[in-house]
Curated annotation (Swiss-Prot):
Taxonomic lineage: Bacteria, Bacillati, Bacillota, Bacilli, Bacillales
EC number: 1.1.1.267
CC cofactor: Mg(2+); Mn(2+)
Organism of derivation: Geobacillus sp. (strain WCH70)
UniProtKB keywords: Isoprene biosynthesis, Manganese, Metal-binding, NADP, Oxidoreductase
Residues annotated as binding NADPH: S10, G11, S12, I13, G36, K37, N38, N121, E123, G202
Protein name: 1-deoxy-D-xylulose 5-phosphate reductoisomerase
InterPro entries per UniProt: DXP_reductoisomerase, DXP_reductoisomerase_C, DXP_reductoisomerase_N, DXPR_C, DXPR_C_sf, NAD(P)-bd_dom_sf
Keyword set includes Flavoprotein: no
Positions that bind Mn(2+): D147, E149, E218
Length: 381
């Protein structure tokens, strides 16, 4: 039996993790969760899975749940509550499925508590990869990727030595607007942006997919997860999202991981690693039915956010923190209808250009840079 905490239980990754726990009651038990403000969802999870601890981000939701479950479930609040859920003593694996940089400190505390990390919050490594990976090594903790692309690379590298790797290739669908010109992108709507052709995901990551910032963040995450320089990390457009990523070795051999676009697969693999279990209600891959797979080179002028991510990643230091914070604020403004789609990349670039570089920022400096960048982007609105 593995005991699971889910940070971000009401989101897309969180709810799919619950599906897996539900499907394998003899393998997994839910011990702790965090939610934002969805009281009904929290009630449903408590009634079905009986977690020992529930962390709540929003004050009104916290007060409601605390009064309802007094003496039955420990209800905790805010960042301290999130940290408590992450480091819960009875937990073996922490699924970090919260969105954004809010996941950084709880992930570090979970690592310090010796928990295995099922990493779905890519911003943790983007903003503080040097700190997180050093902490994981110090405490002997595994960082198991949940992103489909990183899970694919992780699977392709099983039994292989890193010095055999020529490069890794992350595939990208191209998102909602892959066939639109730059001119057409000027007037796209939020509703259009949220229609991803292949994957069912949360709003923020769907917009990131449309701008290709999601792939840029994944490039930075891959740099830290697999300890490879950016020159050995490529991106390939692949419309069908069947090949989730590839590894090319020094002898020119290529190993790829294939599957239908279903996030249950990489989530379950992170929970069961190194074992594999049957996946309930999964559609097996039928290549004859699909018949044809397509691949294209990435146009970095077309996908400016991906270029910005490569540049920030290669520069390192504090720039990835600025990249991430500026992107989060700009995407939020776009989702609220306050800025145009292409203004997202404009605000990110402006934030990067004005930032005073810090080479190896401390955790406190990262938090200050994150907050200052957010204030700057909000001032542009």
């Amino acid at each position: 039996m593995k005991y699971i905490s889910i940070l971000g239980a009401s989101g897309s990754i969180g709810t799919q993790t619950l599906d897996i726990i539900r499907s394998h009651p003899d393998e997994f038990q839910l011990t702790a969760i965090s939610i934002g403000k969805n009281v009904d969802m929290a009630r449903a999870i408590i009634e079905e899975f009986a977690p020992r601890l529930v962390a709540v981000a929003e004050a009104d939701a916290y007060e409601k749940l605390r009064s309802e479950y007094a003496g039955k479930v420990k209800i905790v609040f805010g960042e301290e509550g999130l940290i408590e859920a992450a480091a819960f003593p009875e937990t073996d694996i922490v699924v970090t499925a919260v969105v954004g940089s809010v996941g950084l400190v709880p992930t570090l505390r979970a690592i310090e508590a010796g928990k295995t990390i099922a990493l779905a919050n890519k911003e943790t490594l983007v903003t503080a990869g040097h700190i997180v990976t050093a902490a994981a090594k110090k405490h002997g903790v595994s960082l198991l990727p949940v992103d489909s692309e990183h899970s694919a690379i992780f699977q392709c590298l099983q039994g292989e030595k890193r010095n055999r790797v020529e490069k890794i290739i992350l595939t990208a669908s191209g998102g909602s607007f892959r066939d639109k010109t730059r001119e057409e992108l000027k007037n796209v709507t939020v509703e259009e942006a949220l229609r991803h052709p292949n994957w069912s995901m949360g709003a923020k990551i769907t917009i990131d997919s449309a701008t290709m910032m999601n792939k840029g963040l994944e490039v930075i995450e891959a740099h830290w997860l697999f300890e490879l320089p950016y020159e050995q990390i490529d991106v390939l457009l692949h419309r069908e999202s069947i090949i989730h990523s590839l590894v090319q070795f020094r002898d020119t051999s290529v190993i790829a991981q294939l599957g239908t676009p279903d996030m249950h697969v990489p989530i379950q693999y992170a929970l069961t690693y190194p074992e594999r279990l049957p996946l309930a209600n999964a559609k097996p891959l039928d290549l004859a039915e699909i018949s044809t797979l397509h691949f294209e080179r990435v146009d970095f002028e077309r996908f400016r956010c991906l270029q910005l991510a490569y540049e920030a990643g290669k520069a390192g230091g504090s720039l990835p923190t600025v990249l991430n914070a500026a992107n989060e604020e700009a995407v939020s403004a776009f989702l609220q209808g306050r800025i145009a789609f292409l203004t997202i990349e404009e605000y990110i670039e402006r934030a990067l250009e004005r930032h005073e570089f810090v080479n190896e920022p401390s955790l406190e400096e990262i938090r200050e840079i994150d907050a200052e960048t957010r204030r700057y982007v909000r001032s542009l609105l």
